[in-house]
């Protein structure tokens, strides 16, 4: 019997926050990881920058960098840039969600949100 589960990109857990399944395809794990790293950097700013402004700027910068790298390689794929940007945003917001739930004591093992 073969395993028919679809593998998705997961944000690693920490302390009181279990891993979070982003729903993004596993091939986009790199984008999810970069988004989570950016979220950690935003948290270190301790409110100096509004979350919405930070997320919008970082997602745009990520997409711009990815598109530039594709142009250098001579193979721009607009769809791939778009889904990678969405995975990046899922990583960023997912990490913020993990911190929010942990701070509120809302540790969950719901299969749709955790892995």
Give, region by region, the residue ranges found by the protein language model:
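Short intrinsically disordered terminal tails
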Residues: 1-8, 23, 104-115
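Intrinsically disordered, low-complexity, compositionally biased regions/tails
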Residues: 17, 27, 39, 51, ...
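Short terminal alpha-helical segments
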Residues: 2-43
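N-terminal regions of proteins, emphasizing targeting and processing segments when present
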Residues: 10, 14-15, 36, 41, ...
């Amino acid at each position: 019997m073969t395993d028919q589960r679809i593998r998705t990109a997961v944000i690693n857990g920490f302390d009181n926050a279990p891993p979070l399944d982003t729903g993004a395809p596993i091939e986009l794990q790199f984008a999810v990881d970069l988004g989570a790293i950016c979220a950690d950097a935003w948290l270190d700013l301790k409110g100096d920058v509004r979350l919405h402004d930070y997320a919008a700027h970082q997602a745009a910068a990520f997409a711009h960098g990815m598109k530039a790298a594709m142009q250098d390689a001579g193979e721009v794929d607009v769809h791939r840039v778009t889904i990678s940007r969405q995975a990046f945003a899922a990583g960023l917001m997912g990490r913020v969600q993990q911190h929010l739930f942990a701070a509120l004591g809302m540790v969950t093992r719901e299969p749709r949100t955790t892995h």
